[in-house]
From Swiss-Prot:
Cited function: Assembly factor required for Rieske Fe-S protein RIP1 incorporation into the cytochrome b-c1 (CIII) complex. Functions as a chaperone, binding to this subunit within the mitochondrial matrix and stabilizing it prior to its translocation and insertion into the late CIII dimeric intermediate within the mitochondrial inner membrane. Modulates the mitochondrial matrix zinc pool.
Organism field: Talaromyces stipitatus (strain ATCC 10500 / CBS 375.48 / QM 6759 / NRRL 1006) (Penicillium stipitatum)
GO molecular function: protein folding chaperone
Pfam families hit by this protein: Complex1_LYR
Protein name according to UniProt: Mitochondrial zinc maintenance protein 1, mitochondrial
Gene name for this UniProt entry: MZM1
Length: 113
């Protein structure tokens, strides 16, 4: 059985990795996310009754950041530039109909446009 401090350190590291993946090249947001993560972990330094819930919350937050956050960017010099999404390998893909299909592999037939 793992101790809460080891689990907390692991959750913190996973959260930092997830912020690095989700906010790559957006240093302002990356710094803000990491600062908030640090603040939350510092507020709950001592082991308490809700420590396992806090660790689970951190792991779930890391999962959401890694699988559901997509950042867009466009060329700031061009006023009519199109937004480009930075979709990485961990992003959960699907369409609205696929949400209703539980536990099945979803085949994407066409690319997003």
């Amino acid at each position: 059985m793992t101790t809460p401090s080891v689990s907390a350190i692991s959750a913190y590291r996973q959260l930092l990795r997830a912020t690095r993946i989700a906010f790559k090249d957006d240093y302002r947001v990356l710094l803000a996310a990491r600062t908030e993560a640090r603040k939350q972990f510092d507020q709950h330094k001592r082991t308490a009754v809700d420590t396992p819930m806090q660790i689970q919350h951190a792991l779930e937050t890391a999962s959401i950041l890694r699988h559901n956050i997509v950042q867009g960017a466009r060329d700031a010099e061009k006023e009519d530039a199109k937004w480009e999404l930075r979709i990485h390998d961990d992003i959960e893909r699907g369409d609205n109909d696929s949400v209703k299909i539980g536990g099945k592999k979803v085949k994407i037939e066409k690319a997003c446009s």
